[in-house]
Amino acid sequence: MFLTQTFIYTLTPKFDILISGGGSYARAEYTNFFTNEYSSKNRIGFDSLWLGFIDTGDSIADLIPQITFQTAVVQREKAINQTKNFYLKSQSLQASLRGYSDPVVYSIYTGFGYNQSRKFKTLKIEYGNSIYVGGDLSIILSPKITLDLGAEQRFQMKQKINGYQNSEVRSIPTLSLGSTYSINSDTAVSVNASFGGSSASPDSIFGISLWKKF
């Protein structure tokens, strides 16, 4: 289970500061090979903190361009029995175009994710970079409710451990379906489910988001 908190602070009408932090809860279950005794272990911890910006350009033929950049200030990762913090090791850059045609709000986007290698005591892990392209569609059903649809195609580059390749380039298609309900002009809640289209992606991810304007 994951929990992510995102803050968007508007400096100017076309420039926003983006801050995002996340943590997770995981439960590991074990069965003793010799005694067949069951045991479990719970973990709650901080995972990452990202900092970036959103730059909105002037409209082009009724489409609004945006550039979003983020860098991982800190990421907490575990390999075998070592947990280590990594600083400024991952960055992402995304370009998008947003448009509106009653009753639909839509966007298309493409992006690139960059990962530097991670060095542990006995391991050097190179996760590989990623590129992706996708689109989102929100159908306005009423003044308070939208139906949200999305599709994305991502390619994850080869991964290496201690210089040895242990994965090929992976194609990761996903589809998403959800809905957003506006409680008032400052607050909205949304539910979302995404479904993977390959063995390299999770079968399904379900999420609930709360949006609040201060």
Regions found by a protein language model. Give the residues of each.
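Transmembrane beta-barrel architecture of outer-membrane proteins
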Residues: 1-2, 44-50, 88-92, 130-132, ...
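Residues on the lipid-exposed face of transmembrane beta-strands in outer-membrane beta-barrel proteins
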Residues: 5-9, 48-55, 93-99, 112, ...
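Repeated loop/turn-to-beta-strand initiation elements of outer-membrane beta-barrel proteins
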Residues: 14-19, 58-65, 103-108, 143-149, ...
